[in-house]
Amino acid sequence: AYGYLNFTYRLYTFPWIKFDNFEQVLNNFYASYFAGSLLIPKNKIVDELKKIFSKDEFCASDFKSLLSKYNASPETVYQRLTNILPHDFNIKNLFFLRFSYDKKTDDYALNKELHLAKEQSPSANETNEHYCRRWVSLKVFKDSIANSSEHEFDAQISNYPDDEQKYLVLASATKDPFKDHVYRSISIGIGIDAQLSKKVKFINDENIKKFDVGITCETCSIQDCEVRQAPPKVLDKELKEKETADAVEKLIKRYS
């Protein structure tokens, strides 16, 4: 891709060690897009998706077969879907996430995210809060380790009660090729609305796993969560501040 596009400002390492200017990063994006298009031809994957979307029942093996059909990593296929779904299916309410998981430290890190149309609920936090363990993006790590699988795939419908948003989330986990104790997960979330129900027939399949989820434990209002990692201290603080503000307002009204 770099050669065909005649880019002289480019990156020579993966992962990136450093970049000297924005043009190198931009050219890397263009080259990656071009290479992905060559590896995953548009017409072929569009036809495959139409077949999958036309079925009344969700079948995980259909998606796993799609992800392994090309000479490309699951991440490349998921990235290609962020191009294909908006352009050919008019499905634009999407997010793309890449997590890493360190088995030694039990740490999760969100190191790549893309939001189309708007910033959706699952997004990075900069305050070391605990990401929701109900996300399929994180659950596939444990499944991958337990099953010793090279490619672990799963899907669920994630419901965000506080935002009144629902997403069909597809996720894949693989081992990091450079570090034995590190794993990666790639996921794509598709916003569920009336239009999606017309395009994806299996979206109402009762067999698809469904979970109420939050963003981080510290901001989550879900009660009795079996995988909560921390109390909802941010939410508790906001509620306490609101109670104080309401009490002050009542006093002002009473004595004014």
What kind of feature is each model-predicted range?
Residues 1-256:
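Conserved binding/catalytic microenvironments
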